[in-house]
Amino acid sequence: MDKKKVLIVDDEPDIVTALKFNLELENFECIEAYDGEEALLKAKNENPDLILLDIMLPKINGYKVSRLLKFDESYKHIPIIMLTARAQEKDIKVGEETGADEYITKPFEMDKLMSVITKYLGD
């Protein structure tokens, strides 16, 4: 069986490294992007099964990345989980309006994140 592919988008290299390490332990293939522009390119070129997306990104923010992908017929099927320190109700509402499937605030428990990923990608 092919590994499920997860695109990790965050401008903090330590967060990307930690997520990648944990996801690879669970047998996921990981793709990395460090800004919104790179995220869009990799989403379109790599065809990930799921995207972990920070909001506060250089070049194009996570809200816009989510909106651009979710309102494009070719990519709207890809689940997007927003991972962000922005925990106010208005931020969550904007995340939902952009089409994000889940909104998880930092800091988060890896077990919780893995259960959400499994919800979308199966075991």
Residue ranges of model-derived segments:
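Short hydrophobic/Thr-rich beta-strand motif most characteristic of the beta2 strand and flanking loop
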Residues: 27-34, 42
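C-terminal output helix
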Residues: 108-117
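Active-site beta3 strand of CheY-like receiver
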Residues: 46-52, 57
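Charged docking surfaces used in two-component/phosphorelay signaling
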Residues: 17-25
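The feature encodes the CheY-like receiver
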Residues: 16, 58, 76, 88
